[in-house]
Amino acid sequence: MALDRTTKGVLLGFASFAVFSFSDACVKLIKGQLPPYESAFFGAVFGLSILPFLLRKGDHWIDILSTTNLPLWLVRFLAYPMGVIGSVTAFTHLSMAEAFVLIFLQPAYITVMSVFFLKERVGFRRWSAVAIGFLGVLIVLRPGFRPLSIGHLGALFAGLGGAVSVVAFRAARGKEKNVSLFGAGILGGVIVCGLLTFPSFTPPSGDQWAKLAGYGLLAAVANVLTMWAARQAPAAYIGPTQYSQMVWAILLGYVLFGDGADLPMVAGIVLIVASGLLTLIRENVRGTPLPPSVAGERHVAAALVPNPA
């Protein structure tokens, strides 16, 4: 029986976020043997393979550097490396489930930033979703009851970097070409992380090269799958599929790294996922463009935020 377009889109969405999860597992398998900015650099280099898929008829490679708003372009250029270095740090030092659940607070950051930078009006329900999300984080972190690490700080920067990118996407929506919107971030990853890498460059081993390639190329494949998904189904159906990453995080964490999840962790996961879903539902009702995948600062907004430019 032939599947309708919406069903195909949703299935592609689930597939894309499964691939994203395997990408993050690849960088975690490096186990911190390379600096996070070096892993981020090579991930961005391999991620350049997505750029041809962003080119539309009439686009040119030079359009990556073209912009009608240089400050916003620079924000995207800097936000991506901040987010991806943070996510690599988080996945290196935390369990996959804990890293994901903290990065998944990104929709709450977006709500708060949208008030100040986009002058959006936020009602009681969206503020309630923010409060639920922060409560979930407190339950996961349990400050004062367990030590916090650089991995938790990395997850914070990953979420903030992704949120800054999404707010910049929304501010530039309809005014920039997709290849400029997302090329700025990928270039930022290559250049900024490259500048941090080369003064103390550690040559990867053969095994590490394979993991770095898996990290960057799988993320690129996942981005392409998400774009295909968004061509089949509305963003309102694709957006929630990103939360399937929590299932993959728990499964991969257990199988590959022997991670477990205690009761407070599960409770925090439920609250943070509920917070994100509430935000997605409210933004769909309001007609606000939905954010991209929140884990690992992924540039899939090309699919979830259609751009006529």
Regions found by a protein language model. Give the residues of each.
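Membrane-interface interhelical linkers
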Residues: 1-15, 48-75, 124, 176, ...
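Juxtamembrane helix-entry segments on the extracytoplasmic side of multipass membrane proteins
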Residues: 4-9, 41, 65-69, 137, ...
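Hydrophobic alpha-helical transmembrane segments of multi-pass membrane transport proteins
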Residues: 18-22, 26, 74-89, 157-168, ...
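C-terminal transmembrane-helix exit sites in multi-pass transporters
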Residues: 89, 107-128, 247-266
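Helix-helix packing/entry segments at the starts of transmembrane helices
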Residues: 100-105, 172-187, 223-254
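Hydrophobic transmembrane alpha-helices of multi-pass small-molecule transport proteins
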Residues: 125-141, 162, 264-283
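C-terminal-most transmembrane helix of multi-pass membrane proteins
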Residues: 247-309
